């Protein structure tokens, strides 16, 4: 369904990444990833949980995570493993969360999209509106915020702080990653393949 998502018209190349500030790269990646999600909602009526990492050489991956069956703490560590393996300097993460008060029956689906590096983040939220068939009919923007404390906010902490992996974790995460690679989208943002 989402085999070859197309991004917006902005292309970040390795050359302008070297000259770009971290903040501008985050803003560009956030805008691009948000537009990608808007396109998925309009075209498919669905919003997958996903992670995209970008290396300083312009290599990018897009990993759809809906089929990943790991406890959320292990999933977070696994995602950090992938970002480290592919030498990502910035990443984008998106997916639907449930927010509100379940006791008061006031729970809403919210699409959260974040772009972050080890020191800064930008994150935005959209309320998900579904049609009678359960497909996404609209996304209502709730707000965008940014900051320099990514370790404090869900979805923005994957590159914050240092993380060590045991030999067993490296082996397990490496095997999971090898198994996932055929379904992961890879692209060179410099247009070289």
Model-predicted regions and their roles:
Residues 53-54, 93, 115:
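Hydrophobic side chains in beta-strands
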Residues 2-79:
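N-terminal domain-onset segments
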Residues 3, 65-87, 131-147:
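A signal for specific C-terminal beta-sheet/loop modules enriched in small/flexible residues
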Residues 78-104:
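Conserved loop->alpha-helix
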Residues 38-45, 96-114:
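Short, surface-exposed loop and linker segments with low hydrophobicity and enrichment for Pro/Ser/Thr
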Residues 104, 111-193:
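Glycine-rich, aromatic-bearing surface loops/beta-hairpins
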Residues 46-51, 86-88, 108-111:
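Short, surface-exposed beta-edge/turn micro-motifs
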């Amino acid at each position: 369904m989402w085999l070859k998502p197309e991004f917006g018209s902005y292309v970040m190349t390795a050359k302008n990444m070297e000259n770009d500030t971290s903040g501008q790269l985050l803003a560009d990646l956030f805008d691009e990833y948000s537009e990608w999600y808007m396109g998925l909602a309009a075209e498919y009526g669905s919003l997958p949980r996903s992670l995209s990492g970008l290396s300083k050489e312009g290599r990018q991956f897009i990993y759809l995570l809906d089929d990943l069956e790991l406890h959320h703490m292990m999933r977070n560590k696994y995602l950090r493993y992938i970002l480290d393996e592919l030498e990502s300097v910035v990443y984008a993460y998106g997916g639907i969360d449930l927010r509100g008060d379940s006791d008061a029956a006031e729970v809403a689906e919210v699409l959260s999209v974040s772009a972050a590096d080890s020191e800064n983040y930008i994150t935005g939220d959209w309320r998900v509106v579904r049609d009678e068939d359960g497909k996404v009919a609209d996304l209502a923007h709730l707000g965008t915020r940014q900051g320099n404390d990514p370790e404090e906010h869900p979805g923005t902490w994957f590159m914050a702080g240092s993380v060590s992996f045991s030999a067993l974790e490296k082996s397990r995460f490496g095997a999971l990653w090898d198994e996932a690679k055929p379904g992961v989208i890879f692209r060179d943002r410099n247009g070289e393949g």
